Amino acid sequence: MKPIKEIADQLELKDDILYPYGHYIAKIDHRFLKSLENHEDGKLILVTAVTPTPAGEGKTTTSIGLSMSLNRIGKKSIVTLREPSLGPTLGLKGGATGGGRSRVLPSDEINLHFTGDMHAVASAHNLLAAVLDSHIKHGNELKIDITRVFWKRTMDMNDRALRSIVIGLGGSANGFPREDSFIITAASEVMAILALSENMKDLKERLGKIIVALDADRKIVRISDLGIQGAMAVLLKDAINPNLVQTTEGTPALIHCGPFANIAHGTNSIIATKMAMKLSEYTVTEAGFGADLGAEKFIDFVSRVGGFYPNAAVLVATVRALKYHGGANLKNIHEENLEALKEGFKNLRVHVENLRKFNLPVVVALNRFSTDTEKEIAYVVKECEKLGVRVAVSEVFKKGSEGGVELAKAVAEAAKDVEPAYLYEMNDPVEKKIEILAKEIYRAGRVEFSDTAKNALKFIKKHGFDELPVIVAKTPKSISHDPSLRGAPEGYTFVVSDLFVSAGAGFVVALSGDINLMPGLPKKPNALNMDVDDSGNIVGVS
């Protein structure tokens, strides 16, 4: 690894805006972005993927490798990524810093505590929870209805036992007993707000708008009513600054914030993306989950807030993922199966069609694995060419930037200025926005709203939230809301079970299916593979 000062020098960053965290990590003062206003924006490349499978598609690995490969062919590039969540790192998923010869470094530190941003978000979130219950205990001047408190508690850990709890037990000295729950930190609205805020003023204004409860008269109670947004911003003072690290080939990477891609927008901070666009020719950024969730939200929501628009989309696919979506069993996923591949290619086709609805040039990155056969690779390449999309076989995991040169050249050729094309207008009613997304992206035949959802729509209209963008929270395992429907389901009924407003983040969340905001650990969590020796060397994290 190179000292972080050398990485900063590549970007001509001065010492007075850098806050080093050891030898290989530094924060960049978020106010530095203001000084870059007159710099021309580079091109923005959005990396997304086909519908995720249990085996993983290598989207983060591809994002990192693409940025390294662009640098290799003489195109100055920065990759911007979300911060990993500690819970999934210790649980089923493991680390989230890429793999093989295409990683961000120092991987162990990034995957674990990093610069403390997750801790800061959790602290700000839980400060509000504590102040809220303290207010209720000490007279409840705001007349908060304790049966209608929306704000949960949070921790950055997978712990299913905390999904439903009762607090305030043990007598009046401990407050009023009520039901509560914990969510994982990545699902906190504070995390979404941090990722969307462009400066401290914006951050405090957004925090103040958060809806925490209803009062006895069914009126909204916000953080600004409690007056705690300033203290929350104090706890986030350093977390608002993007984190500078490096790739395995010593090229720059910005890693900042980590909002969920279902309950929120699922991408790194707007500050980091805009800063990277000012400092490079090509910014490579990643959207969470598949293109139906992450890419749609990036374009319809994040791009509008940030004032930018992608110049091209990279759709990551693997032969094994397409075979899985074609009905192949995971146990036999590494065996050649052209029939399953043919059927599963329909999933890729849907995502290509969807991305084209946003006016985006699409490049398919076929992430190659050692078990892929030449016939399978040739089939995918041929079918992509029939669709009229560029396709490049990527081997960045095995070969680093050398394995991504073909992909980098294809992306550089494809990237262009495009006319933004959003799926819905902001003044469309919320239910119309949902119907557009369900039919255009998820390929549903019709949309059905539960009675709970219908009541939520009335609340949204009554309080003036109807013109907010919509974030759909559904399973990432299918284009539909049903995780059992692989491939390219269509014509089904898309069911909206509930809606709620993230007023500080600035969107309405539409829930479809079972969405769990506090994951649990598997029988054998990844934590069992981890250890540290007497010299401080860590094993089993990434």
Curated annotation (Swiss-Prot):
Keywords: ATP-binding, Ligase, Nucleotide-binding, One-carbon metabolism. It catalyses: (6S)-5,6,7,8-tetrahydrofolate + formate + ATP = (6R)-10-formyltetrahydrofolate + ADP + phosphate. PROSITE patterns: FTHFS_1 (PS00721), FTHFS_2 (PS00722). The keyword Repressor does not apply. GO terms for biological process: tetrahydrofolate interconversion. NCBIfam families: PRK13505.1. This is Formate--tetrahydrofolate ligase. It comes from Thermotoga maritima (strain ATCC 43589 / DSM 3109 / JCM 10099 / NBRC 100826 / MSB8). The gene is fhs.
